[in-house]
Amino acid sequence: MPQMISFGSEMIRINPAKNHIEFSTNSGRSWNTRCSSTSSGTFMDLLPYGNEILAITSKGIYYSTNKGGSWNNRCTSTSAGTFLSLMDGGKELLAQTSKGLYYSTNKGGSWYKRN
């Protein structure tokens, strides 16, 4: 599913046809590729989170500190199941997974089941 977010003065999106991260500085009238690397897996969802962008990929949770130009793994092995969506819950990061609702208090490094 394509995902688009606003981050600073830019719009940032996943181009699912190419699995690229793209950005626009003119309200989406034109798009430029920012990241075309596939080492992070297939991008599925984006979330602005403080000064980072978090991404759900086919390999887990990844983060970027340079507007999506490069990605680092934050959580690639978890008993939480497959990540489906992320939400900024204020003091916690929330994730809907294939096994239910999970929360993290360390930017997605570890996950705990919410009952």
Where are these regions (language model features)?
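Surface loop/turn motifs at the tips and blade-to-blade linkers of beta-strand repeat domains
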Residues: 35-39, 75-78
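Repeated scaffold domains used in trafficking and secretory/extracellular systems
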Residues: 1-8, 40-49, 80-90
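Loop/turn residues immediately N-terminal
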Residues: 18-21, 59-62, 99-102
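Residue-level marker for isolated small/hydroxyl-bearing positions within beta-strands
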Residues: 14-16, 56, 96
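Conserved Ser/Thr-centered positions that define the repeating blades of beta-propeller domains
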Residues: 24-25, 64-65, 104-105
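An edge-strand/N-cap motif at the start of beta-rich repeat modules
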Residues: 1-34, 112
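Hydrophobic beta-strand positions that form the internal "hydrophobic ladder"
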Residues: 11-13, 53, 93
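Short coil turn/linker residues within repeat-based beta-strand modules
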Residues: 28-29, 68-69, 108-109
